[in-house]
């Protein structure tokens, strides 16, 4: 099995830019192996929300750290961005921070793309997935060097070159919520990304088998694929604090169809805040006992995931990092 890694999710929707950078730096100081960041033009909620630019955060944290792996979880390189420009940006970061950068990609959400000018009805999954695959092909062709002509269904290049590229390009991690994209991740991604709290059968019967199938079709060793999961966990020795911390992140407990189709953070906030706290908690591991926390997290390792990235919902992130380093990290490391 691939190496066990522990990571920190920097919540760009919750914290202002300077604080978000300081948290990324603190993640390395507290022993995390990676720090990932979301890429939102608009946050999940209007009141108290933030949405700093992910690539600015990565470079700022990269300059102040030495070893931690940095990446997006995730970015959509297909609508408000031109994938060639994203390829250039990540190639530059790959040169600045060798072997420390990855590009995590997904198919996109209306919340971020409609406000920035996407015209017409929000595309169905089939088109969004096709755009994603094409953008990955385009970026990799650019990273191979030489001049590139590319005539795709959605994107075109004419004599394009990226002049500063790290050897081998940049690892691409592909986010999947279902088996079709998971199979693609196994076939074409250096990494695979999913999120926690969706029921054992999704991971054991759909996602992980699909990743393995995709790897087999491509003749790849599945152990070479970094299998990342964002674990939504509210850990605090105070049970009431652990529960209250999750309220800010109620939008994550909405159905996938709602999250993908709502394009206004004010509406998103209104719909999410109508959810009872008990329903919000179903998406989270809400715990006060470290052994219980590790037992519930450990099931994901048993199911085949090796890179555990922790999304803590509370406003006091330094407290979480301190508690994680003291109470959870030593226990979790033993799982590997």
Swiss-Prot record:
GO molecular function: coenzyme F420 binding; glucose-6-phosphate dehydrogenase (coenzyme F420) activity; oxidoreductase activity, acting on paired donors, with incorporation or reduction of molecular oxygen
Domain of life: Bacteria
Entry keyword Oxidoreductase: yes
EC number, as in UniProt: 1.1.98.2
SUPFAM superfamilies the UniProt entry points to: Bacterial luciferase-like (SSF51679)
Keywords: Carbohydrate metabolism, Oxidoreductase
Entry's transmembrane regions: none
Record-linked Gene3D superfamilies: Luciferase-like domain
GO BP of this protein: carbohydrate metabolic process
Residues annotated to bind coenzyme F420-(gamma-Glu)n: 39, 76, 107-108, 112, 177-178, 180-181
Active site, per annotation: 40 (proton donor), 109 (proton acceptor)
Enzyme class: oxidoreductase
UniProt xrefs under InterPro entries: F420-dep_G6P_DH, F420-G6PD/mer, F420_G6P_DH-rel, Luciferase-like_dom, Luciferase-like_sf
Reaction catalysis annotation: oxidized coenzyme F420-(gamma-L-Glu)(n) + D-glucose 6-phosphate + H(+) = 6-phospho-D-glucono-1,5-lactone + reduced coenzyme F420-(gamma-L-Glu)(n)
CDD domains (alphabetical): Tetrahydromethanopterin_reductase (cd01097)
A Pfam family it matches: Bac_luciferase
Binding residue positions for substrate: 195, 198, 259, 283
Subunit: Homodimer.
Protein family (similarity comment): Belongs to the F420-dependent glucose-6-phosphate dehydrogenase family.
NCBIfam families given in the database record: F420_G6P_DH, F420_G6P_family
PANTHER family registered for this protein in UniProt: 5,10-METHYLENETETRAHYDROMETHANOPTERIN REDUCTASE (PTHR43244:SF1), PTHR43244
General function of this protein: Catalyzes the coenzyme F420-dependent oxidation of glucose 6-phosphate (G6P) to 6-phosphogluconolactone. Appears to have a role in resistance to oxidative stress, via its consumption of G6P that serves as a source of reducing power to combat oxidative stress in mycobacteria.
Protein name stated in the entry: F420-dependent glucose-6-phosphate dehydrogenase
Species the sequence originates in: Mycobacterium leprae (strain Br4923)
Gene name linked to the record: fgd
């Amino acid at each position: 099995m691939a190496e066990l890694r522990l990571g920190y999710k920097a919540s760009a929707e919750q914290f202002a830019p300077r604080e978000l950078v300081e948290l990324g730096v603190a993640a390395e100081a507290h022993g995390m192996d990676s720090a990932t960041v979301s890429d939102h033009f608009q946050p999940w909620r209007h009141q108290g929300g933030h949405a700093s630019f992910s690539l600015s955060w990565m470079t700022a944290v990269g300059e102040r750290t030495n070893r931690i792996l940095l990446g997006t979880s995730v970015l959509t390189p297909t609508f408000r961005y031109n994938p060639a420009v994203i390829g250039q940006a990540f190639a530059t970061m790959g040169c600045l921070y060798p072997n420390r950068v990855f590009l995590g990609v997904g198919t996109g959400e209306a919340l971020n793309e409609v406000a920035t000018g996407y015209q017409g009805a929000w595309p169905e999954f089939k088109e969004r997935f096709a755009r994603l695959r094409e953008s990955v092909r385009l970026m990799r062709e650019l990273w191979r060097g030489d001049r590139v002509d590319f005539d795709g269904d959605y994107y075109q290049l004419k004599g394009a070159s990226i002049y500063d590229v790290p050897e081998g390009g940049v690892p691409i991690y592909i986010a999947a919520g279902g088996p079709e994209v998971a199979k693609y991740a196994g076939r074409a991604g250096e990494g695979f990304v999913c999120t926690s709290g969706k029921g054992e059968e999704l991971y054991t019967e759909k996602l992980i088998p699909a990743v393995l199938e995709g790897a087999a079709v491509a003749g790849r060793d599945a152990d070479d694929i970094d299998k990342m999961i964002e674990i939504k966990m509210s850990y605090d020795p105070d049970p009431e604090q652990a529960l209250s911390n999750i309220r800010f992140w109620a939008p994550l407990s909405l159905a996938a169809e709602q999250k993908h189709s709502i394009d206004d953070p004010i509406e998103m906030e209104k719909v999410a805040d109508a959810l009872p706290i008990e329903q919000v908690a179903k998406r989270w591991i809400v715990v006060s006992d470290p052994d219980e926390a590790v037992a519930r997290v450990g099931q994901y390792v048993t199911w085949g995931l090796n890179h555990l990235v922790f999304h803590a919902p509370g406003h006091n992130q330094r407290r979480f990092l301190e508690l994680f380093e003291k109470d959870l990290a030593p226990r979790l490391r033993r799982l590997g």
